[in-house]
Amino acid sequence: MGTSLLGGVPVAENVPLAPLTTLRVGPVARRLVTCVTTDQIVDAVMAAGPEALILAGGSNVVLAGDAADLTVVRLANTRISVDGDVVRAEAGAGWDDVVAASLAHGLGGLECLSGIPGSAGATPVQNVGAYGAEVADTIRRVRLLERGTGSVRWVSPEFLRFGYRTSVLKHSSQWVVLEVEFGLDAAGHSAPVRYRELATELAVEQGERTDPQRVRAAVLELRARKGMVLDAADHDTWSVGSFFTNPVVSRAEFERIAATVGSAVPNYPAEDGVKLAAGWLVEQAGFGKGYPGADAPARLSTKHALALTNRGTATTADVLALARTVRDGVKAAFGIELTPEPVLVGCSL
């Protein structure tokens, strides 16, 4: 009996998805198709139909544990090319490999995003960002497959409507990212170092540019201290990174919170108001690092209170229960409802 195919691509049956995600929870897929070329992705996605799940690095997704009869198309096209100051990455390329390749060619601009797990194709969906930078700063265009029609086209940043940790792609299954192009600094300067903690680590002024290799090294060190660099032996890294986004509140709301707390509230300027540090809110609401304790299957990282981690035996239900407890506790303490950063598939808070 021959191997079954989907869109001309071999199908694996009854495949556990937990090992394919950084949180290491999820269901068993009835069918898994792994595509190593962009053409294979297009053919497999169109053959699989609108209900198929698209999965790449699995670093920013929480999968329902009880999903049944699931077909998954896994993006494993990994080519990275550099032409002058333009870096083009296929969707399945490891994100940190893209950053490293850009720096190897003397290009600055992505170094603040070093060490973020996952794939290049996920970055425009989420408008991935860290340490004062986000991919919207450098994306030139994105190649998309429209699932309803099968058409493939390049789109501009204007089409993508980037926002804080979001884009037009995040809340729609209509589009599949195939490739991403970045326009970088050919002179080899880093992006401006906007984040205070990173500037302190580098001993530079906020807003200053410096050697991007130094920035990368500093970012990787900072991330490692917080358990934000993947390590299979360290359960503090079995997560989706920061589980909640930093909330943006009005100036009046910020002043109300500051008056309630009676001490300095970490904050940052934002277009629509004041951005608060979600990790600080979580800890101030009573959820310290490691909550609720060593015996819990899911708990906050011992290094970073904003990361919800799988201690080795957690299920999706365990992770979501912890997330609800933290979200509701912050709402009770401050009147602010935190928004989850990862994409929740087949489940909700």
Curated annotation (Swiss-Prot):
GO cellular component: cytosol
Keyword annotations: Cell cycle, Cell division, Cell shape, Cell wall biogenesis/degradation, Cytoplasm, FAD, Flavoprotein, NADP, Oxidoreductase, Peptidoglycan synthesis
EC number per UniProt: 1.3.1.98
InterPro entries (alphabetical): FAD-bd_PCMH, FAD-bd_PCMH-like_sf, FAD-bd_PCMH_sub1, FAD-bd_PCMH_sub2, MurB, MurB_C, MurB_C_sf, Oxid_FAD_bind_N
Reaction(s) the record says it catalyses: UDP-N-acetyl-alpha-D-muramate + NADP(+) = UDP-N-acetyl-3-O-(1-carboxyvinyl)-alpha-D-glucosamine + NADPH + H(+)
Biological pathway: Cell wall biogenesis; peptidoglycan biosynthesis
Location in the cell: Cytoplasm
Keyword Cytoplasm: yes
Cofactor(s) this protein cannot do without: FAD
Domain FAD-binding PCMH-type, first and last residues per copy: 25-213
BP terms from Gene Ontology: cell division; cell wall organization; peptidoglycan biosynthetic process; regulation of cell shape
Catalytic center residues: R165, S242 (proton donor), E341
MF term (GO), any: FAD binding
UniProt cross-references to SUPFAM superfamilies, sorted A to Z: FAD-binding/transporter-associated domain-like, Uridine diphospho-N-Acetylenolpyruvylglucosamine reductase, MurB, C-terminal domain
A Pfam family hit: FAD_binding_4
Family statement: Belongs to the MurB family.
UniProt cross-references to PANTHER family, sorted A to Z: UDP-N-ACETYLENOLPYRUVOYLGLUCOSAMINE REDUCTASE
HAMAP family: MurB
Function text: Cell wall formation.
Name listed for the protein in its UniProt record: UDP-N-acetylenolpyruvoylglucosamine reductase
Origin organism lineage: Bacteria, Bacillati, Actinomycetota, Actinomycetes, Mycobacteriales
Gene: murB
